[in-house]
Amino acid sequence: MTRRIRSIVACAAAVMTLAQPISARQAFDPARGRSGLIAPATQVMVLGVSHLDNAPKAFDPAWLEPVMCRLRTYAPDVILTEAMSGEQLAGIDAYKAVRGDAGKWAGPTLAIAGDAQAALGITGPDAMAQANALMTGSTPTAADRRRLAALFLAAGEPFSAATQWLQLDPAERLARDGITETMKTKVERFGIGRGEIVSMAVALAVRLGLPRVYGAGDHLSDVVLPDNAAFGAAVRASPEIIAQLDKATPSLLFFGSKALALDAPDRVMPVFRTLNSPAFGKADAQAQWLSLQQSPKLGALGRQRVAAWEAQNLRMATVVREVTAPIPSGKALLIVGAAHKAFIEAYLRMMTDITIVSVPAMLDSRPTGC
């Protein structure tokens, strides 16, 4: 009888252990793997920005120099942006019956990719494969850079094409080695603009002599977005949600668009400090996203919208992890809309070989020449 009682007690103890919260049983945490690394963890800096295409008309990309100088000092080995990769664009385009029209996100990219593929007589994947092979060689010649620009255009990677093109001497920016006159015009357009992809990512890659920039943006997750009409109606019926989305509540006014407008050179550093502060990350996540899934009026629609947002950010974090795989202990920089920053950093912190570099510390640093 005593043995039977002991057996029952042991079984009950096992059941109680299984019933405990996962945290109480010390669930596997990938981030703990960093403690056993044989070398320093790979560094990732996630720089949050307000999309510069939407900046006030007075904004001049030259105002960004204090930030750019510090980024040059950080000297990333790879640079990623919120642009979609050519591979994802092609996939969405192929599955447009399911995924929708990729052209609404990157119509010019798809158009020039089609033209370049026709001119070169290759497919997008073949163009990317050839570009990868050419980048593994010795220091590229002018002819190599022109060829790479053509291949990147065909692969749906116009910002990488611009990165190669702008590393050519102006006299070498010629329509040859696969570049047609039309392609020359288009690649030059992709290298001009005040949006952060061009004015920050491409400009920095050119200055550092990097071969390309990587698109980490995602719209595969759009397929799980809630019905737009129903979601819009639910939001319009929720003034408290609108106030948070517009950052019109007293606690959010400091983070509103007017407070963060880049309307003068001396506003750049304060705005970047705010957008990359933990306080902004928490407040913005609550206002834009968590509030949606906490609203009884939005119900399942709000939760579905947040699910799509999380899926989008998880995919972006995945791209960062893939791109950093070949550079263990190296440095990566992701330039992205500030709303993404807190989520992507949280997901990257779960990785076994990633450490997040502090943007506030970078902005507060005073490197020589900055």
Question: Model regions: which residues?
Answer:
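Bacterial N-terminal signal peptides that target proteins for export
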Residues: 1-9
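Bacterial N-terminal signal peptides
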Residues: 10-19
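N- or domain-start disorder-to-order transition segments that initiate the globular core
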Residues: 25-45
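Proline-aspartate-enriched helix->loop->beta-strand connector
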Residues: 75-81
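Low-complexity, serine/threonine/proline-enriched polar segments
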Residues: 102-168, 246-290
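Extended, H/D-rich, highly charged conserved domains that either
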Residues: 165-167, 172-297
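A cross-kingdom marker for long, charged
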Residues: 256-370
